[in-house]
């Protein structure tokens, strides 16, 4: 992928993540107007992830057959419509319908990852995945602050703005993004590349890829468990308003970008991607365990910053490991399966977090630390597999 083409993809990813960054920190406070509480915010978050679980591997496989560009555009148009549904919502049912629609068309991340896999080599893959992850992260940095400010105009304004942003991203993908799948490959693989849900199982049996996907599932579950704790702890314990929540979330996301941009530096010092993942996962565990003991804004922020820093390395390393150990004609499908299992983590994390908040909000952070600990132990296995 040439620098110009990569720049276009990065711009689209920034635009896409900006919309999500605007609304995600506001879901709980906005949903409370319709009766959303500690338990149901987990279900609302999970609705998106369940729909995405079924959709992303199919969309990824379709991108292998028909090309990345049309599937990316469809995903972004679906996101635009879902944000509009949120803005016009009159009750809880519409909120859930909007999240489900966004999940069903939520193949943008896996398709973008497949585009990087198409056009990179093992040598520069981690670097390009780091750039892509930082692009998504950059939108999350700006988004919460923008959403917090727009919410002062009206509760619906952040969702209108996010819809416009998603529409711009879709139009950019249609008019400015070049296809990365070779036409001859698409034509010859239309019949051979039909997706089967058995891939959700067979992919896990791939020696390195399966372990990496499961580690990603655990770390995603930990992150989305933390997000529920972040939202409820910020509102109910720290008593922060929407603007301050947005700024705090912005700081958390910014730390991840710093590390993602440093991926080339880390890969020069440590050649093993699995070893980098191992060390960063250990740091995430320590940070999350510490956060469970915090009670004021300053100490809570310290824990989030440390976690955000080292969690930022996760996706570039895991995605590079998966792409390195995958065949070129299955990049979209396998990245879709990877995103599908991440969706399970996005589902189970909020649900278990919602149950734990019934007893202790601090317990959510300890639960997240437990998931990270399991992932850390599995990363030892991944490291040995990569060496062999």
Question: Which residues does each predicted region cover?
Answer:
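Juxtamembrane intracellular "pre-TM" segments in multi-pass secondary transporters
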Residues: 1-3, 178-213
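Short amphipathic helix-loop junctions that connect adjacent transmembrane helices
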Residues: 25-39, 228-244
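Helix-breaking motifs and short loop linkers at transmembrane-helix boundaries and internal kinks
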Residues: 35, 67, 88-93, 293-295
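Residue-level signature of mid-helix packing/kink "hotspots" within the transmembrane helices
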Residues: 49-57, 107, 140-141, 253-261, ...
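Helix-to-loop junctions at the C-terminal end of transmembrane segments
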Residues: 56-67, 259-272, 357
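Structural signature of the two symmetry-related core transmembrane helices
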Residues: 70-85, 275-289
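Cytoplasmic helix-loop-helix junction between adjacent transmembrane helices
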Residues: 98-138
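Helix-loop-helix hairpin linking two adjacent transmembrane segments in secondary transporters
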Residues: 131-175
